[in-house]
Amino acid sequence: MADDKEMPAAVVDGHDQVTGHIISTTIGGKNGEPKQTISYMAERVVGTGSFGIVFQAKCLETGETVAIKKVLQDRRYKNRELQLMRVMDHPNVVCLKHCFFSTTSKDELFLNLVMEYVPESLYRVLKHYSSANQRMPLVYVKLYMYQIFRGLAYIHNVAGVCHRDLKPQNLLVDPLTHQVKICDFGSAKQLVKGEANISYICSRFYRAPELIFGATEYTTSIDIWSAGCVLAELLLGQPLFPGENAVDQLVEIIKVLGTPTREEIRCMNPHYTDFRFPQIKAHPWHKIFHKRMPPEAIDFASRLLQYSPSLRCTALEACAHPFFDELREPNARLPNGRPFPPLFNFKQEVAGSSPELVNKLIPDHIKRQLGLSFLNQSGT
């Protein structure tokens, strides 16, 4: 199918109902090729929210299954999610295939984002394990978290974007290959230093403490906190900080990390001076997880879930953590013996990183393979 991410989006006559309907749209031909008509049969709704709906659809011309996110579009503004998705291209970020606008009988304008279809979410995988009264095997925790951080490294470093709503529902998993893709850029934004942002973003259990403190000049480290919460949830089988409201959310965090110091509060929000918290000691990390939890898993969680945003490791530093060393072993495989999805085909996300970090990220056996391919290319 032709990829028209860069083309202006066509407007088609949509339907008020979704499932069972056929939506036809035209995509522009590239390099002088004729335009193509593409038709989608809407099959079932797979997600709903304040934004609109996501439905599974089949392309009638190719038989390919896609996900279409349909959102109400304000005619006065460009859609930020569309602008961001058009420039992103990474194995751990869901791919935008193309987009079109549709109208309803009430003359409402909807934007339809046509994306690759990934059948499962980390949320549903977690529910599967908890309903079976099981913990997720550690190799899957490592594999999923590594890919999440790799996707974040690309989003943060290359696209310059903060996701701002990282949670298990927005992390898609292919059950056959175990490839993970970050999705839903409806809250995402390119953060500009010195420019204020809203603090009321991110789903509560995964919301960084600086957001609870009302900070407006936060950084991409809010995504690192959210990823730390996801890691803890995969290890525990339940959310680490299950707050019932914004204030209770902070209480849940304090019960684990202890009361933040004045300096930590200043790091989170320099304008927050109302310091009236009960003095609670930090709960040791090793007591939060079960006795057999590997020390590198506990160390990793503690490096992500820090009050001071600047003390949290970056996404690439997270990928290099010893917690993921098992994935870098030469004979590492999925439990069923199949190979892992590609984990080390780094490109833009390592640009500007120190040689030491790149050295840690790329295993020796991969370096040897790359070295051989370079030798072959040079004809020696």
From Swiss-Prot:
Domain Protein kinase, first and last residues per copy: 40-324
Protein family (similarity comment): Belongs to the protein kinase superfamily. CMGC Ser/Thr protein kinase family. GSK-3 subfamily.
EC code: 2.7.11.1
Modified residues (Phosphoserine): S105, S187, S310, S353
Tissue: In the two outer cell layers of the developing seed coat and restricted to the suspensor cells in developing embryos. Mostly expressed in stomatal lineage cells with asymmetric cell division (ACD) potential. Observed in small cells of non-protruding hypocotyl cell files and of developing cotyledon epidermis.
Inactivation phenotype: Increased stability of SPCH and formation of excessive stomatal and non-stomatal cell.
Annotated function: Negative regulator in brassinosteroid signal transduction pathway important for plant growth. May be also involved in auxin signaling pathway. Phosphorylates and increases the degradation of BZR1 and BZR2/BES1 by the proteasome. Phosphorylates BHLH150, beet curly top virus C4 and tomato golden mosaic virus AC4 on threonine and serine residues. Upon brassinosteroid signaling, inhibits stomatal development by phosphorylating and inhibiting the MAPKK kinase YDA and the MAPK kinases MKK4 and MKK5. Phosphorylates BSK1, BSK3, BSK5, BSK6, BSK8 and BSK11 in vitro.
Position of the signal peptide: none
Keywords: ATP-binding, Brassinosteroid signaling pathway, Cell membrane, Cytoplasm, Host-virus interaction, Kinase, Membrane, Nucleotide-binding, Nucleus, Phosphoprotein, Serine/threonine-protein kinase, Transferase, Ubl conjugation
PTM section of the record: Autophosphorylated mainly on threonine and serine residues. Ubiquitination and subsequent proteasomal degradation mediated by KIB1.
Protein name: Shaggy-related protein kinase eta
Complex and partners: Interacts in vitro with the C-terminal fragment of BZR1 and with BES1/BZR2, but not through the kinase domain. Interacts with BHLH150, beet curly top virus AL4/C4 and tomato golden mosaic virus AL4/AC4. Interacts with YDA. Interacts with MKK4. Interacts with KIB1 and KIB2 in a brassinosteroid (BR)-dependent manner. Interacts with BSK1, BSK6, BSK8 and BSK11. Binds to WRKY46, WRKY54 and WRKY70. Component of a complex made of POLAR, BASL, ASK7/BIN2 and ASK3/SK12. Binds to POLAR and BASL.
GO biological process per UniProt: brassinosteroid mediated signaling pathway; detection of brassinosteroid stimulus; leaf morphogenesis; multidimensional cell growth; negative regulation of brassinosteroid mediated signaling pathway; positive regulation of protein export from nucleus; protein autophosphorylation; protein phosphorylation
Lineage: Eukaryota, Viridiplantae, Streptophyta, Embryophyta, Tracheophyta
Underlying gene: ASK7
